[in-house]
A protein has these predicted regions:
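A Rossmann-like FAD-binding core segment of flavoenzymes
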Residues: 91, 95-129, 188-280, 332
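Short, well-ordered coil/turn residues at beta-beta hairpins
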Residues: 135-136, 173, 259-260, 300-303
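A conserved FAD-binding loop/helix module that cradles the flavin
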Residues: 301-332
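Conserved hydrophobic helix-helix packing surfaces used for dimerization/oligomerization
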Residues: 9-11, 32, 170, 193, ...
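FAD-site-proximal beta/loop scaffold in flavoenzymes
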Residues: 150-164, 262-311
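Beta1-alpha1 glycine-rich phosphate/pyrophosphate-binding loop at the start
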Residues: 4-5, 14-92, 180-209, 278-279
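Beta1/beta-strand and adjacent pyrophosphate-binding region of the FAD-binding site
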Residues: 3-17, 168-173
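Predominantly flavin-linked oxidoreductase catalytic cores and closely associated redox partners
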Residues: 120-195, 200-210
Length: 332
């Protein structure tokens, strides 16, 4: 944690990758501060309430602490409990509900300008650090619909739980795990579900236990499927689809869950001098050290993958901090 003065490392983001980086800083004797705009591991807090991870518990572990769960795979709740215990065990003292509003590059270090996310709480003073690690994830940057009606209150880019939708007609847009799992949960809670996906088939990355379930529900028409179709307009009580033949269909609808994935905060990265390249918009970093082209600036976690968010998970992002800290120590 911070000891005052200029930090060795400022870590922006209090998710698993950020916490793992902080632990590595601690082990290397580097002064550090974790700065998180929300609560601890806020991205996991935002997951659907009943979500089960795709992976086994040991692949979510950081700092050598075991994650104990009651089933083969951990739940969202178990992960939240685990990461709280990690923060306590290592005395990480993250600065929570504090947003990094801007980063200035000085001759020898960085100045981070902070803004409180808590109403009525004054903004803290700036933080200076020789190195900055952006472990910021992408959950604040959902891929949004660009059609008439997308601004209506009935449209959401995040699914939390089934209860508010009971007895309603809900359109779930997307073909990945988030969309498929939301559609299944809603169906089992008494919701009339329509699943819409522009692809002719669902994602090849579906969890192995989700694929047969969603495919069977679609085959039995228990969930109405519109594959190879796109939404053209959203209205208060319906939406218009265009199928692969070009035909248009009006579908009665109460709520829309557009679960279309996420993207990195490109504007923020560009403001710091971080370029992105390729069709997947991957930020330019050294693949071994995760250093950007800006001296002293590193990326960690999901933001490294660009738009290919399925390529970096907690399972591999948790090791980024080790490589980053090794490079910082080698170049001091």
């Amino acid at each position: 944690m911070s000891t005052g003065g200029v930090l060795d490392v400022a870590i922006v983001g209090g998710g698993p990758s950020g916490l793992a980086t902080a632990i590595e800083c601690q082990r290397a004797g580097l002064s550090y501060q974790v700065i998180e705009k929300g609560g601890l591991v806020d991205s996991i807090r935002r997951f659907p309430v009943n979500m089960i991870f795709f992976t086994t518990p040991e692949l979510l572990e950081i700092g050598g602490m075991p994650l104990v769960c009651h089933r083969e795979k951990p739940s969202r709740y178990e992960a939240l409990v685990y990461y709280r215990k990690v923060a306590q065990r290592y005395d990480l003292h993250p600065r929570l509900f504090t947003r990094v509003a801007g980063v200035e590059r000085n001759s020898d270090d960085f100045t981070l300008h902070l803004k409180s996310e808590r109403e009525g709480i004054p903004d803290p003073g700036p933080v200076r650090a020789r190195n900055v690690v952006l472990a910021i994830g992408y959950y604040e940057n959902p891929n949004r619909l660009d059609v008439p009606g997308a601004e209506l209150d009935k449209v959401s880019y995040r699914y939390v739980e089934t209860h508010p939708y009971f007895g309603s007609k809900v359109a779930v847009i997307g073909g990945g795990n988030s969309a498929a799992e939301a559609a299944l949960e809603l169906f089992r809670a008494g919701v009339e579900v329509t699943l819409i996906h522009r692809g002719e088939t669902l994602s090849s990355h579906l969890k192995y236990w989700v694929r047969p379930d969603i495919e069977n529900r679609l085959a039995r028409r228990e969930i109405t499927g519109w594959l190879g179709s796109v939404v053209e307009e959203i209205r208060m009580d319906s939406l218009t689809l265009r199928d692969s033949s070009g035909a248009r269909h009006e579908v009665p609808n109460d709520f829309v869950l557009a679960l279309l994935g996420y993207r990195p905060p490109y504007r923020f990265l560009e403001s710091l001098g971080v370029r992105s390249e390729g069709a997947d918009g991957r930020p330019v970093t050294d693949p071994e050290t995760f250093a950007t082209e800006v001296p002293g600036l590193y990326l960690a976690g999901g933001v490294v993958a660009g738009r290919r968010t399925h390529m970096v998970f907690i399972e591999n992002g948790r090791f980024h901090g080790e490589a980053i800290v090794r490079h910082i120590c080698a170049t001091r």
